[in-house]
Amino acid sequence: MQTYGNPDVTYGWWVGNSVVTNRAGRFIGSHIGHTGLICFAAGGSTLWELARYNPEIPMGHQSSIFLAHLASLGLGFDEAGVWTGAGVATIAIFHLIFSAVYGTAGLAHSLLFDPDLKDGPIPTTKKFKLEWDNPDNLTFILGHHLIFFGVANIWFVEWARWHGIYDPAIGEIRTIFPGYGDFGMVYGHQFDFLTIDSLEEVMSGHAFLAFVQISGGAWHIATKQLGEYTEFKGKGLLSAEAVLSWSLAGIGWMAIVAAFWCAQNTTVYPIDWYGEPLALKFGISPYWVDTGDVSDSTAFLGHTTRAALSNVHYYFGFFFIQGHIWHALRAMGFDFRRVVGSVASLATTES
């Protein structure tokens, strides 16, 4: 974290990042604990939505964010192909069980194991110690993250290929075989990806991402900094705060892209589960409004699931980007205390 040259800086209890900044063991513990919270939220919210689900009202007009995602993945259908929530409670309970496992593991890494991996007894773990101004260390860890993302993409593609996912074009679950190697098709959708209306193209894009991420991950793990580590390559800029700012930029950008996807695309976000497409409006800021009849909507202040998802994603993404700018400026050495001091001195001069 930025200390502005003060070696004895102290942080308040609310600055949670300061506890794990230079302690890789606790950093991992916080990641695992965060995973547990996500699992608990997913499992608990799914049970909450399932208990209130009314089959006489369209799913997109109810509180159905988690149910809609499961339905899109082809889960919750009976043998006749009708969505009844079959097996959804089991999935939710498994998430709650795993949340307890993740929570216990997070506490173990935080309280029982070595807070700094470079002091640990296992030689392999020392490679994952945190050295924020060491590009070789950061690229090694980045490589593993990319491989995990690539594997997740493969799982999704294989799920669609063997189990099948919901195709709104025919109103039922079907298996999807991606066009492996059809990179031209993927490349051709750089600017019109919001209009994709084929699940084969969606899965081909995920297969392409898997290839790029796993290849990039292997590259980052196997390679090191070429030549001298100069200021042009980031010397003096790499820090915990800089990495935090880039992470915020990434998640903010993904949230904004997801908002546009959800608002307009009815192949990835079917009308059957999310409600009708939205219209983009402009007021103090951009926002989306429902275009269909939502008089029967029972949640989200009378709006559809699609409207709730799109608007919340957009505004969260916007504020994540602001957080990116804040932390990026701090990482570059900008002292916001000078702004406060300048405003205070200006006010004193005017008075």
Curated annotation (Swiss-Prot):
NCBIfam families: PS_antenn_a_b (TIGR03041). It comes from the Bacteria. This low-light-adapted strain contains 7 pcb genes. Its cofactor is divinyl chlorophyll a; divinyl chlorophyll b. It comes from Prochlorococcus marinus (strain NATL2A). Pfam families: PSII (PF00421). InterPro entries: PS_antenna-like, PS_II_antenna-like_sf. Keywords: Chlorophyll, Chromophore, Membrane, Photosynthesis, Photosystem I, Photosystem II, Thylakoid, Transmembrane, Transmembrane helix. It is found in: Cellular thylakoid membrane. The antenna complex functions as a light receptor, it captures and delivers excitation energy to photosystems II and I. The Prochlorales pcb genes are not related to higher plant LHCs. Its main location: membrane. It is a multi-pass membrane protein. The chain crosses the membrane at residues 27-47, 81-101, 140-160, 202-222, 242-262, 309-329. One of its GO terms (biological process) is photosynthetic electron transport chain. One of its GO terms (molecular function) is chlorophyll binding. GO terms for cellular component: photosystem I; photosystem II; plasma membrane-derived thylakoid membrane. This is Divinyl chlorophyll a/b light-harvesting protein PcbC. Belongs to the PsbB/PsbC family. IsiA/Pcb subfamily. The antenna complex consists of divinyl chlorophylls (a and b) and divinyl chlorophyll a/b binding proteins and binds more divinyl chlorophyll b than does the antenna complex from high-light-adapted Prochlorococcus.
